[in-house]
Curated annotation (Swiss-Prot):
Organism: Thermococcus kodakarensis (strain ATCC BAA-918 / JCM 12380 / KOD1)
Keyword Transcription regulation on entry: no
Molecular function per GO: ATP binding; ATP hydrolysis activity; DNA binding; endonuclease activity
Protein name: Replication factor C small subunit
Lineage of producing organism: Archaea, Methanobacteriati, Methanobacteriota, Thermococci, Thermococcales
Modified how: This protein undergoes a protein self splicing that involves a post-translational excision of the intervening region (intein) followed by peptide ligation.
Superkingdom to which the source organism belongs: Archaea
Length: 866
């Protein structure tokens, strides 16, 4: 198969989305559920529903990407390996929180649901102007600002130089000031620990810094003997003889360490402000435009950018060769950035402080800007008739916030006014002439219009002027003035006489005369009212307008910096990749420098069948794991529930995914919300475990339990997809897919697509390769050899599975547990072996060496087989 065909298979839309059921008939293997749901469609009514069933993977980065988890900086690979214990695929995790952004571009802390490890043959390497470097899978989405001003998630393979990558403007500072952290900053900057003599020296030409280092050393290490030394031919230093200080730097791996290996130790992170100030005092310089920190350690440079982001300071990394050696320059430039650096970190070094203060007064207009979607902003301006005339396509961050905030204030006023105008325009201005005839005498008295004139109006011999018409309506208890005024305001402010005239098929001057004069053309005035009501409805339901308003809200509130992409390059090889699954927002902050990276079927099918083409208007999808809590969910529900369903439906549907992520208190609040809107809203709650849903909610719902699918149901769907995609699906390949899927259709489809990337012929060999599973016959053979007493051959087979096939020990144990029940041995031995497998699995979880433990388990098999 050609490389070109392989790439198409890898990069196209995931098949789990492509073949997601659109109708109830398409749902596989859940006939008992489909039958009940179809009954709801037929009757047009339904109770609240609770969908319970197992979960379903994401886009990935390389392991060297940095990520802040639970307030500490990790390499992504290190973090995932620690949680998964080397296992490939998804591993559930609890209590792990990472930083990400919400829909308004604001930084939030999110719970990670599971970590993920996989392999990839292709990666996309992205470099930016500020020195960021990301290696991600081709279909990994990144949040970018495009040249046309659009802000959108774009697959890595579709990125182009000139696109601007979303970068968090602020990260939470990891800790406050700390004398030990400050001492470490000085030591790593200009200190040295002599491994031979076990003494520490601090070399610096600034007397105040040497004095500060001596004060800290005396305070932190009571056993220290300290001496300041002034030399004739080299820089002065501070000599420290302290067992405690030596043991500290030695325990941190900093004794005798070369400059290209230094890093920020954990104790430095605990007082990162103090560490950075001391480190910058030693190793940073101030040139004509920026503060520049030079280090030979890429690890240190990347950590410093994360630490600076904790104080809202954006920096960039540049490589520089000096006499054949690579150095990394962390650069802080731009007036706003430097000002924040001085206020949050600062210099103790007086000369550096004074030079930086001068730079603050020289702003750089080329930094900290973004491309704006002028076409979309202009559309909002023209649709709502806003007073705005800036036609520049690139704005600074400050300008974007200021202008969008001013526009949003005006937009909120206009939308509120439009809602009020709509309410006024929704009332007809036509009166009941029969009622007027019956009450003619009374109306004459109230209005001062002669009774005979009223009779002429009734018989149609004369038409009343608008002024008299309003008086008559008022006498009948109808106030027309708000409606007439609303018509005039809308025509002047939000539409035009010409637009209304085109709709009416008349001249704009005629419309103006009818609207603005004491006209007698009441029927034409009523037609204008209907047209204006239609136009105002079009404005308020205008999807492009909503998109534009959302865009302006994002500009006014986001906490992002936009870093220009300078290079996009494809890499080929055998890569191990990692991901964190963040439910709800599906993104987190990662990279060598902080960057924003990305990561329901039955409910959607039911909504489509119940509401037809109006399903989008009557269906709201929310995620219960939203970090902002039940109050935000409740507000969205209120906003959605206050309008009537479209298309004749008697209720709307709110789909609440991951409902079991809610706390008990939040579920109680949800119960009250469900009761409050039970008249016109039905809730569908989706969860992995119905036992985690409180009884009061369960009792209000019809419960649907989605069971693992039967092999024949999965096989039918897999054959259909394979035929549709032009694949040759062998029977062995199909059976292998069924084996690894274990009743999960989503997993089966993912495995099929991954195998198709290798070859259009789907064989069992390719399936087991992409699924990171051993062949079941290999596992059975290994266990059989051990039971027959051939321990060395069984051990050789184990090593083949672990090393050649690249599986983890836990993967092998899981398959052994599955296959032990297929062995031709007595039941009591199966029970004993299953118990042993469980025992050794616990040992691996506790961190024991997997090769030793698995060989010991095979030894147990050999003993039991005798």
């Amino acid at each position: 198969m050609s490389e070109e065909v392989k790439e198409v298979k890898i990069l196209e839309k995931p098949w789990v989305e492509k073949y997601r059921p659109q109708r109830l008939e398409d749902i596989v293997g859940q006939d008992h559920i489909v039958k009940r749901l179809k009954h709801y469609v037929k009757t047009g009514s339904m109770p609240h529903l609770l969908f319970a069933g197992p979960p379903g993977v994401g886009k990935c980065l390389t392991g060297d990407a940095k990520v802040i988890a639970n307030g500490r900086l990790f390499e992504l690979g290190e973090l995932v390996e620690k949680v998964s214990k080397g296992r490939f695929g998804p591993t559930p995790v609890e209590g792990l929180k990472v930083l990400g952004i919400d829909e308004d571009g604001k930084l939030r802390e999110f719970e990670v649901q599971y970590v993920y490890k996989d392999r990839a043959e292709r990666l996309i390497k992205v470099r930016t102007r500020l020195g960021r470097e990301l290696k991600v899978t081709p279909y990994h989405p990144l949040l970018v600002n495009r040249k046309n001003g659009e802000i959108m998630w774009v697959k890595a393979e579709e990125l182009r130089p000139g696109d601007r990558l979303a970068v968090p403007r602020f990260l939470p500072a990891i800790a406050e000031e700390d004398p030990l952290a400050e001492w470490l900053g000085y030591f790593i900057g200009d200190g040295h620990a002599d491994s031979k003599n076990k003494v520490i020296t601090f070399t610096n030409t600034d007397p105040s810094l040497r004095q500060r280092f001596m004060e800290l050393t005396e305070r932190l290490f009571p056993d220290a003997k300290i001496r300041e030394r002034i030399h004739k031919n080299r820089a002065p230093d501070v000599y420290v003889n302290s067992r405690r200080a030596w043991e500290l730097v030695s325990s941190l791996g900093l004794a005798g360490r070369k400059a290209d290996k230094v890093y920020i130790p954990e104790k430095g992170w605990e007082g990162i402000r103090s560490f950075l100030r001391a480190y910058f005092d030693c190793d940073a310089g101030v040139d004509k435009n920026a503060v520049v920190l030079a280090t030979a350690s890429r690890e240190m440079a990347e950590q410093v950018t994360y630490a600076l982001a904790g104080f809202g300071i954006t920096s960039k990394i540049r490589e520089k060769k000096v006499r054949g050696k690579t150095y990394y320059h962390v650069t802080i430039s731009g007036s706003e950035n430097l000002e924040r650096f001085l206020s949050e970190i600062g210099f103790s070094h007086r000369e550096k402080l004074e030079r930086t203060l001068k730079l603050v007064k020289k702003p750089n207009p080329n930094l900290d800007s973004l491309n704006v979607n002028y076409e979309l902003i202009s559309y909002v301006r023209d649709r709502l008739k806003l007073n705005f005339s800036d036609d520049k396509r690139s704005w600074s961050h400050r300008k974007a916030r200021k202008i969008s905030w001013e526009l949003m204030k005006e937009i909120y006023y206009r939308l509120d006014e439009l809602e009020r105008l709509k309410e006024s325009l929704s009332r007809s201005i036509l009166i009941d002439w029969n009622e007027m005839a019956e009450r003619r005498k009374e109306i004459a008295e109230k209005t001062g219009i002669r009774a005979d004139r009223l009779l002429e109006y009734i018989k149609g011999k004369r038409k009343p002027s608008l002024r008299n018409y309003i008086k008559i309506a008022k006498a009948l208890g109808i106030d027309l003035e708000p409606t007439i005024n609303a018509m005039r305001v809308f025509a002047r402010k939000y539409s035009s006489y010409a637009e209304i005239g085109r709709k009416l098929g008349t001249w704009n001057s005629s419309v103006r005369i009818i609207l603005e004069s004491n006209t007698e053309k009441i029927k034409e005035l009523e037609e204008i009212r209907k047209i204006e009501l239609e136009l105002i409805g079009e404005i308020l339901s205008d999807e492009k307008l909503k998109e534009g308003v959302a865009y302006l809200i994002f500009l006014s509130q986001n906490e992002l910096y936009w870093d220009e992409i300078t290079e996009v390059k494809e890499l080929k090889g055998d890569f191990v990749i990692y991901d964190l699954h963040v439910p709800g927002y599906h993104n987190f902050i990662a990279g060598n420098m902080p960057t924003v990276v990305h990561n329901t079927t039955a409910a959607l099918a039911l909504a489509r069948e119940l509401f037809g083409e109006n399903w989008r208007h009557n269906f709201l999808e929310l995620n219960a794991s939203d970090e902002r809590g039940i109050n935000v969910i409740r507000e969205k529900v209120k906003e959605f529930a206050r309008t009537k369903p479209i298309g004749g439906a008697s209720f709307k549907i709110i789909f609440l995914d991951e409902a079991d992520a809610l706390t008990q208190d939040a579920q109680q609040a949800l119960r009250r919300t469900m009761e409050m809107f039970s008249n016109n809203v039905r809730f569908i709650l989706s969860c992995n475990y119905s036992s985690k849903i409180i009884e009061p909610i369960q009792s209000r719902c019809a419960i649907f339990r989605f069971r693992p699918l039967r092999d024949e149901d999965i096989a039918k769907r897999i054959r259909y997809i394979a035929e549709n995609e032009g694949l040759e699906l062998t029977e062995e390949g199909l059976q292998a897919i069924l084996y690894v899927a274990e009743g999960d259709l989503r997993r089966a489809i993912n495995v099929l697509q991954a195998a198709a990337a290798l070859d259009t012929k789907i064989t069992d060999e390719n399936v087991f390769l992409v699924a990171s599973r051993a062949r079941p016959e290999d596992v059975r053979e290994m266990m059989t050899l051990a039971l027959e007493g051939n321990f060395l051959k069984a051990r050789e087979k184990l090593r083949d599975i672990l090393l050649r096939q690249g599986l983890s020990g836990e993967d092998v144990l899981i398959q052994m547990h599955k296959e032990v029940f297929n062995l031709p041995i007595p039941e009591d031995k199966k029970v004993a072996l299953a118990d042993k497998i469980g025992e050794y699995n616990f040992r691996l979880v506790e961190g024991a060496n997997e090769m030793i433990q698995l060989e010991a388990l095979l030894a147990q098999f050999t003993i039991m087989g005798k």
